[in-house]
Amino acid sequence: MSGHQVRNFKAICGKVEREGHATRRFTLVRSVAEQPHALLRAALLDQGWREGDPVTAISDGDPALPALVRSATGGPVEHILDWFHLSMRVQHVEQVMRGLCALEPPPLARLDPAQIDVERLRHLLWSGHHDKACEALGRITGWAKDAAMLNDPAVEAGMRRLAARCAERRSYIETNEGALIDYGERYRAGKPISTSRAEGTVNQLVSARMNKRRQMRWSPRGAHRVLQVRAAVLDGQFGHQAIQLAA
């Protein structure tokens, strides 16, 4: 979000969901919220959460949300990395590989060994085999670096790009290892694996008027207050007349 006193600032938005309970939205600008953990804790308590109950936080990898949840609960929290963001990083590797396969004339080095590993990546991560995914990324990186020495400059650039992408993805997986799960198993159990529903909440709370593309400037405190009102309105905490005024 764009600010008029600082160039930009971060707002945390999310949803608290529990089976059999109405969804509660929460949002805040942490830099100005006096007790940010209290806002989330209130939403958890409203959902029937009690001290010691397990809590799962699904995020895009930003450490701010799981840290806030741990502060609010005062206990351990299962943090899950959103499948969509993880999948997109695999897609970037697949795109580079497809570009290499489409080259004419084809590269001197055979692409089969790397292509097999690239095609396995998504399945390995989906099935919870994160160590095997890292091994595959390591093999692709080594192969691409070696293959770059055998080809013309145009092909070399593609090979080095593939090596760089794979090295970055391996580092990303290793950094977030504690938040990676068997997504297939969780999905089959009917449990969420993505932040997509929460991202819809972001679109509801951070309306067009607060979008940086509208060139409007907000102070962190002003944005924090507006977000609190919008969350309360969307959760039905105000009467009909108040909703008309605040929408």
Describe these PLM feature segments.
Residues 1-247:
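Catalytic center-proximal scaffold of phosphoryl-transfer enzymes
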